[in-house]
Amino acid sequence: MSISPQEVKKLRDATGAGFGDCKKALSVAGGDFELAKKKLKEMGIVSADKRSGRDAKEGRVFSYVNTERVGLLLIACETDFVAMNSDFVAFGNSLIKQLVESGRDILDEHQELEIKNLAATIKENIYVSKVYISNIASNELVKNYLHGDHSKIGVFVKFKIDDVLKMQDEKLNNFAMDLALHVAAFSPLYLSVNDICLNYIKEQEEIFMRQMESSGKPENVVKGIISGKLKKHLGEIALLEQGFVKDDKLTVKEKIEEVSKLILSKIEVVEFKYLSVG
């Protein structure tokens, strides 16, 4: 039977076993997820590598962008020393380039084997923790950024540009890079307040209500305080509502509008991604 890459990825995430081993186990199990997990244990795959049980709390973020896609990759390891190792860094840079150029966010058998070989050479638990690949349209501009020599934070920001002739505008590109730096510094969780789920907003409102229970203030005053706290909190986690890193008198949304007027073309942030070690 045919086993999809998504099924293989699910089993791989659950067990830590390699791509090829997961695919083989699923095939033997006829696609049954729980049975495939059992087969991996029977094969001794899940616990075969003693290093796989050790904590890998360090790592490095890698990024690559071409005209069609942008990608972020987080590879975990046990020590910061290994995260700076030249072989580790070269492998990560090569892998993210391969993934972006292929458009895949799942490693193939050869790439899985390369990781195993690297782990055996370096003698640490090394694995791909997160991969994110995003397509770039012809009217979109992307800026990616890796923070510091150790690259423990990696981000990209994607803009939609109404007038594609403005794509090379210096003011636009400088702002785009500044916003990538902003995302790295402030690690927003959402693009806009509208993207925040209602359940989260309700839970946060209830937290503020409990905090005000013993305040002794009139109900209408309490409601006003809670509303203000909620607005402030949501603004802190939504990119467009955050104070811009280079001019906190303006929100990111207001800065975007300002740059749009400067370059005589509407620009819009349509996506961002933030990855960090730990």
Curated annotation (Swiss-Prot):
Residues 79-82 are annotated as: Involved in Mg(2+) ion dislocation from EF-Tu. It comes from the Bacteria. CDD domains: UBA_EF-Ts. Pfam families: EF_TS. InterPro entries: EF-Ts_dimer_sf (IPR036402), Transl_elong_EFTs/EF1B (IPR001816), Transl_elong_EFTs/EF1B_dimer (IPR014039), Transl_elong_Ts_CS (IPR018101), UBA-like_sf (IPR009060). PROSITE patterns: EF_TS_1. It is found in: Cytoplasm. Its main location: cytoplasm. One of its GO terms (cellular component) is cytoplasm. GO terms for molecular function: translation elongation factor activity. Keywords: Cytoplasm, Elongation factor, Protein biosynthesis. Belongs to the EF-Ts family. PANTHER family: ELONGATION FACTOR TS, ELONGATION FACTOR TS, MITOCHONDRIAL. Associates with the EF-Tu.GDP complex and induces the exchange of GDP to GTP. It remains bound to the aminoacyl-tRNA.EF-Tu.GTP complex up to the GTP hydrolysis stage on the ribosome. This is Elongation factor Ts. It comes from Borrelia duttonii (strain Ly).
